[in-house]
Amino acid sequence: MNPTLKNQARNVSPGTIIRGKWHHCKYRTVRLLGHGANGNVYLAESSNGRVAVKIGRESMSITSEVNVLKQFSRVQGNVLGPSLIDVDDWVTTDGTHPFYVMEYLRGQPLLSFIREKGEEWIGILTVQLLADLDRLHREGWVFGDLKPDNLLVSGPPPRVRWFDVGGTTLIGRSIKEYTEFFDRGYWGLGSRKAEPSYDLFAVAMIMLNSAYPKRFDRKKEGQRQLREALYESKALARYRRVITSALEGKYADAPSMRQDMVKAMSVPPSKPKRTSRTQSRKLKKQTKKSREWLQTFLFAAFLFVAYFLYLFGAH
């Protein structure tokens, strides 16, 4: 691709024809799918059906993302991300724009799927996501900008997939792209070093986001604020220990968090505590039952002793 490119990704209107400079393939845009720091992703029509086209801001970031997608394709049983289809440059009157074409993943946004299907899917999809992250981490990468906006639920059967790898970073380097709500640095709970625990923090925040779809800004000490939000959510009650451990960076790898998630899913949600009035009423009933049982026991004992004395006196 051309190394001398504009710094800004081009905004493309529906119906625009994107023609590759080198491979000469044509793509007609349908609508915007998403946007990020490195460029915009569009749904487009091609000679082979619908595809997703990402138009980048500069060549280096696009090359990096293409390398990640190629790496994904070498993972056995790959379901980590979309398949890479084409890489090219698009020449327009205002410059040359790098782009790549990938498989269009049909699905439903993660949060709307959970809202429609029910909160029990929070755990199921999180376990799936952690399994995929484990494979990504073992290949030497972290996702980086992990958030619901980059996740879809495809199927049936329902399967969580990610479609924008713009923030994917080699382990050991600095995270190159992030969103504040899902960034542990923003909450004062860790660095922006690319390591598995960075992604696992984001997984915990995705679970919080499922309970608080509108998200919220940091207004106090980060750990305290997140803990308060967690304990106010009934939907996340059974996952509190797992989420807390992920927020505090206690998981070194995805399998450890996944194992605890599976355990948490097997335990029924805790019942709400009874009010003091309810407890008092229950205590009175228990006291009354105990008194009645004692009276019955004493009467039975009296009959037994009386019968024994009767037999003893008969001889």
Language-model features: locations:
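Short beta-strand micro-motifs within the conserved protein kinase catalytic domain, predominantly
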Residues: P82-P98
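C-lobe/activation-segment region of protein kinase-like
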Residues: R161, G166-R240
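Conserved short submotifs of the Hanks-type protein kinase catalytic core
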Residues: T93-P109
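ATP-binding glycine-rich loop module of kinase domains
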Residues: L5-Q8, K26, V30-R31, H35-N67
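Activation segment signature within eukaryotic-like protein kinase domains
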Residues: L125-T126
